[in-house]
Amino acid sequence: MFMTYQPKKRQRKKEHGFRKRMSTQSGRNILRKRRQKGRKKLTA
């Protein structure tokens, strides 16, 4: 048995990063909602 979460900075940014969010309409919606809510961190 080993830990299933093997964090990688590059992979995380590629999947959940700002540019990835901006690239799709639904991603932009996510950012808009998070801005409305007042999140300090919008993306990973």
From Swiss-Prot:
Gene Ontology biological-process annotations: translation
Membrane-traversing stretches: none
Zinc in keyword set: no
Keyword Cell division: no
Keywords: Ribonucleoprotein, Ribosomal protein
GO MF entries: structural constituent of ribosome
Record-linked InterPro entries: Ribosomal_bL34, Ribosomal_bL34_CS
GO cellular component: ribonucleoprotein complex; ribosome
Region named Disordered: 1-44
Protein name in the entry: Large ribosomal subunit protein bL34
Gene: rpmH
